[in-house]
Amino acid sequence: MTKRYSVLAVMVFLASAPAFTQTEHSAPAGKPGGYVLERDKEVAKNEPGTHKGGGETIGYSFFAKTPNLKLVFRKRAFKPGSAIGYHVQREDEIYYVLSGRGMMTIDGKEFEVGPGDAVLTRPGSSHGLKQVGKEDLVILINYEQAPKP
């Protein structure tokens, strides 16, 4: 449980950092220690809603090119009417709402989410998320994957 809160705290810190344009590395690739700093403007990409959700979103895939990293850390900004399509979850995944409002559906149950809400979706569950209202819905997404070489 403590690990989840630590990951969530890091996610909130990174998402609230100001946007710049350069990736920083403290140590050459393959050496132990150090850090990687990526900024919103470096990784922002206009994308349709994932899982066939539709609409316009801006996806931020932080550290996607970092070797040997199991942690996936993303931010997504949903424009009005956009969504993550309803799909089956394969691994634990955390959604954290930074701003805006959304309608989440998990295993057929709908509920509204807003700033400060964190939702853990478990393997085997089905879920989707739709932006509601006039303001963009901005969320953080975190899950583990097999590390990339």
Outline where the language-model segments fall.
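Short histidine-centered beta-strand/loop micro-motifs
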Residues: 63, 83-89, 130-132
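Ligand-binding loop in jelly-roll beta-barrel domains
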Residues: 67-68, 123-148
